[in-house]
């Protein structure tokens, strides 16, 4: 039979920290908060605007005709989506202009 040797002075590989001292972590978000705010706003609009349009028009504008109310609600969903895409393109163009100005200043 073999016996296990117990030595308290030996260190295993788990006892060594190979990385050294920890560096401060960068916890800032990768996406600017303005972009997140716009996304959340358009998400809220995408949920509430078509549903609100449907119920408003089915009860007061079209007097119970759900077909026209549903069509108008679908149109409003597309309006919100197109508005978000246009705003995203504008934000991207602004970022590209800022980067171009920074590169011109470096030269």
From Swiss-Prot:
Residues 1-30 are annotated as: Disordered. It is a multi-pass membrane protein. HAMAP family: VMA21. It comes from the Eukaryota. Residues 63-68 are lumenal. Keywords: Cytoplasmic vesicle, Endoplasmic reticulum, Membrane, Transmembrane, Transmembrane helix. This is Vacuolar ATPase assembly integral membrane protein vma21. Belongs to the VMA21 family. The gene is vma21. It holds the Pfam family VMA21. Its main location: endoplasmic reticulum. GO terms for cellular component: endoplasmic reticulum membrane; endoplasmic reticulum-Golgi intermediate compartment membrane; ER to Golgi transport vesicle membrane. It comes from Pyrenophora tritici-repentis (strain Pt-1C-BFP) (Wheat tan spot fungus). A motif (Prevents secretion from ER) lies at residues 104-107.
């Amino acid at each position: 039979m073999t016996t296990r040797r117990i030595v308290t002075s030996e260190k295993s590989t788990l006892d060594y920290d190979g990385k050294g001292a920890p560096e401060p972590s960068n916890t800032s978000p990768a996406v600017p908060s303005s972009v997140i705010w716009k996304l959340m706003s358009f998400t809220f609009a995408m949920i509430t605007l078509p549903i609100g349009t449907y119920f408003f028009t089915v009860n007061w504008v079209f007097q119970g005709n759900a077909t026209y109310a549903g069509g108008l609600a679908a149109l409003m969903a597309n309006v919100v989506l197109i508005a978000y895409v246009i705003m995203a393109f504008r934000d991207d163009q602004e970022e590209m202009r800022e980067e171009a100005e920074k590169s011109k200043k470096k030269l």
